[in-house]
Regions:
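Conserved catalytic core of sirtuin-type NAD+-dependent deacylases
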Residues: 1-256
Length: 256
């Protein structure tokens, strides 16, 4: 058992607390890490699946590669870290969440201040006319045409104008969501404590956000199974996310 007292004391006493989450948080819900041994990036077509030029050329590459991973996200439930962060928000001890994940599980857990720096499939937009559809609407279109896991050529949901619907996930060749990243920078700059959870801090520019907290005099508490470039600068370093969640739930009981 790791010593969580320094982290819990900091959460309890800090003026402003934020959290930054990565793939490790969602693997506890059963969602594979894109960069892990069984992840999407082991797919030989990985670079094309999330490439905006490829999507505009042939959107079926994306819908083939992600029909189960992205359009099966509705089957997953929030894990212990998602629920622990919701508990901290309810206790008035968390000002916001910056997430690199696209699975929408923080919102599913009930967290209200979530900034998705790599975007989210919660909305899809037509690449031709810009019309918007919700994740649920696109899912309904996919299910009506064979479902997410159907073998053979994937169904590509299209607008009435003929354009393909693309999720608001940031593809290679696209900029990060402007509003979400600006709000994330503001949150990081104003944090007395940032909890860095389940991310190895290797994907920029998002990985630079904890540095903003450090530069402004804030403290980092890192919980990640693998080393990160900022371990030596953290106030404390831990490895077990499930233990972190249990410690938070114990220290901040519901209703208090």
């Amino acid at each position: 058992m790791e010593d969580w007292k320094p982290l819990l004391d900091a959460i309890g006493s800090a003026g402003r607390v934020s959290a930054m989450t990565g793939a490790g948080v969602s693997t506890l819900s059963g969602i594979p890490d894109f960069r892990g041994p069984q992840g999407l990036y082991k797919n030989p077509d990985a670079e094309r699946i999330f490439d905006i030029d490829w999507f505009d050329r042939d959107p079926s590459v994306y819908y083939r590669g992600c029909r189960e991973l992205v359009y099966g996200l509705g089957e997953f439930s929030p894990g212990p870290v998602h629920l622990a962060l919701k508990r901290l928000e309810d206790a008035g001890r968390l000002d916001g969440i910056i997430t690199q994940n696209i699975d929408m599980l923080h919102q599913k857990a009930g967290s209200s201040r979530v900034w998705e720096v790599h975007g989210s499939p919660i909305l899809h937009h037509c690449r031709r006319c810009g019309a918007a559809r919700s994740f649920g609407e696109v899912m309904a279109m996919i299910e009506a045409n064979g479902g997410a896991a159907t073998l053979g050529e994937p169904y590509v949901p299209r607008c009435s104008c003929g354009g393909a619907y693309k999720p608001d996930i940031t593809f290679f060749g696209e900029s990060l969501p402007e509003v979400a990243f600006a709000r994330s920078q503001e949150l990081a700059a104003n944090s007395d404590v940032m909890l860095v959870l389940g991310t190895s801090l290797t994907v920029f520019p998002a990985a630079g956000l904890p540095r903003v907290t450090l530069q402004r005099g804030g403290k980092l508490f890192i919980v990640n199974a693998q080393p990160t470039p900022l371990d030596d600068f953290a106030a404390a370093r831990y490895s077990d996310l499930a233990e972190f969640a249990a410690a938070v739930m114990s220290a901040f009981p519901a209703g208090r």
